[in-house]
Amino acid sequence: DLTVRDVEPHMPAMDAYYEAEYLRDGDFWCSHEGSTAIWLDQYRYVCHLAGIGHDAEGVAQTVHEAYRRAECWETYADVTACLRALKERGYALGVVSNWDAGLEGLLRDLRLLPYFDTVVSSAVVGYRKPNPVIFNLACEQMGVRAESSVHVGDRPDADGDGAAAAGIRAVIVDRHDAEKDCGYERVTALTDLLELL
């Protein structure tokens, strides 16, 4: 049986594999089939690195199915409090994500969906960040103007550049203080937004 101990040493290689694919052509995020394929490819890759290539397909499918369940996720401690505070202040909140068609269900199962007025997933709409179209779709669905909006994300390339191209103020959540020179406003905790906005 594959354990976390078997896989953990190979996670940096899996992350590098994903980043290389994303930079080569991140359009896999524009369809449910494409996003599923990239996840399965990553899991098979880790299986081969961990020396279990003989059952890589079965393990990849099992991991992918588990990954879609809320119990396999843990939100940062500041998420719910920040979302609640923003809603109490009257902000319209939306999700813009390079994700598969299961995003809304996952957010529901994590009990986060009620905080959001819209969820825009790249696999559902056919556009991915940093394309400004996906940001504009979210603004349109929420009935807000781009120039009065703020996009909060963790990737300067997808989130910062995409929001800026759409005319939206960008804030990067940099929990590990690794993006000091990203060119966008930064916070190291989500609750820092409450002072920034």
Give the location of each predicted region:
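Asp-based, Mg2+/Mn2+-dependent phosphohydrolase catalytic module
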Residues: 2-5, 53-59, 80-85, 91-197
